[in-house]
Amino acid sequence: SLLSPDIEKQRILKKVCEDNKIEFIAYSPLSFGILCQDPNYISKTNKSLLRNSIFNGYNKPTIRLRKSIKEIAEKRSVSMAQVAVNWCCYQGAIPLIGLRKQSHVLDISKVLQWDLTKEEYNKLEEASTSCKKLPGNPFTSN
């Protein structure tokens, strides 16, 4: 995910996986939906207390990144979710996406119909480096 805490560490791990012919899976490429939120989104109370606290803590610190995602999405006439997932695919990762609605499945299935350009990828990388990252997953080993 563009909000992963240590992208460089993940790149090293991906190289090890490639060298050993192991597929690399990108967990939570939408960062709990944060990367799908319009940059002008004003947080409202969500049904889930956990989800609401995550959104409130990451709304402002990710505005620049979400603006970049939205610009690419609008230019290509795709969703912000497609852009965030395509960033993972660009690196050769298999995204593991939590989708709850049929409309989301149909939207994300279109990711396979296009690829980010090098310029778009670099724009997302640059915006990602300057924003608040999600905490590491407590269920993974280091």
Segments (PLM) and residue ranges:
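Beta/alpha (TIM)-barrel catalytic core signal, keyed to glycine-rich beta->alpha loops juxtaposed to Asp/Glu
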Residues: 1-142
